[in-house]
């Protein structure tokens, strides 16, 4: 009786272990077959471990190979981007990385200076824009003042032209009046001269007749 009871207890323990293992495998997402006994189970464990170790080792080797190939490709690209000088083929990986680091530092400094210059130019642009707007307002004001002054000047010029025309009319009238007066005076003088001459002629003719009457010899001649 004791032997069958021990066998039953062993089977119950194995069944319990199997159930616990199935629960753990269900939690992790995988399952395994129920071993027939502990020896077979141990053998399967050893085989699975050896297979896993060989698989992991080959996977690691493949990953390392890919990593080194990617690193070589990156170093070749880095040689193109970083200025190395005439002896670029003799540089080691360490010297290449050191030069790349210093080159990156220079690029960062240049980028900072460029950003500072851009900000300064933007400030100058805003200042010039404000000045341009101010000059535009000032120009508009000066144009309005200039147009007002030109209109006033044109009005004053028209007034001066009117005054000049009126003074010219007065001057021509005075000239006409003086010329008419001078012509009248000339006519008067000419008439007086003619009358004087006629008087003188009349008197001279009278004197001649008197002389002829006094001297009959002259008449006979």
From Swiss-Prot:
Cellular component aspect of the GO annotation: nucleus
Repressor is among the record's keywords: yes
Subcellular location: Nucleus
Record-linked InterPro entries: bHLH_dom (IPR011598), HLH_DNA-bd_sf (IPR036638), MXD1_bHLHzip (IPR040157)
Bias (Polar residues): 192-202
An annotated GO BP: negative regulation of transcription by RNA polymerase II
Annotated region described as Disordered, given as residue ranges: 28-67, 176-202
Purpose of the protein: Transcriptional repressor. MAD binds with MAX to form a sequence-specific DNA-binding protein complex which recognizes the core sequence 5'-CAC[GA]TG-3'. MAD thus antagonizes MYC transcriptional activity by competing for MAX.
Protein name: Max dimerization protein 1
């Amino acid at each position: 009786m004791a032997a069958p009871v021990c066998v039953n207890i062993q089977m119950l323990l194995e069944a319990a272990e199997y159930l616990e293992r199935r629960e753990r495998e269900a939690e992790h997402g995988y399952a395994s077959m129920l071993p027939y006994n502990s020896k077979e189970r141990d053998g399967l464990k050893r085989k699975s471990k050896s297979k896993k170790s060989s698989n992991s080792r080959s996977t690691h080797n493949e990953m390392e190979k890919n990593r080194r190939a990617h690193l070589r490709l990156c170093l070749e690209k880095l040689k193109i981007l970083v200025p190395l000088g005439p002896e670029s083929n003799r540089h080691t990986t360490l010297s290449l990385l050191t030069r790349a680091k210093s080159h990156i530092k220079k690029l960062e400094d240049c980028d900072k200076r460029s950003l500072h210059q851009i900000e300064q130019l933007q400030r100058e642009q805003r200042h010039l824009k404000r000045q341009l707007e101010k000059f535009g307002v000032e120009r508009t004001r000066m144009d309005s003042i200039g147009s007002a002054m030109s209109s006033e000047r044109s009005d004053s010029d028209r007034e001066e032209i009117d005054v000049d025309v009126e003074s010219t009319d007065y001057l021509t009238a005075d000239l006409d009046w003086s010329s008419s007066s001078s012509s009248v005076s000339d006519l008067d003088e000419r008439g007086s001269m003619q009358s004087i001459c006629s008087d003188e002629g009349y008197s001279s003719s009278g004197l001649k007749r008197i002389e002829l009457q006094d001297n009959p010899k002259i008449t006979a001649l």
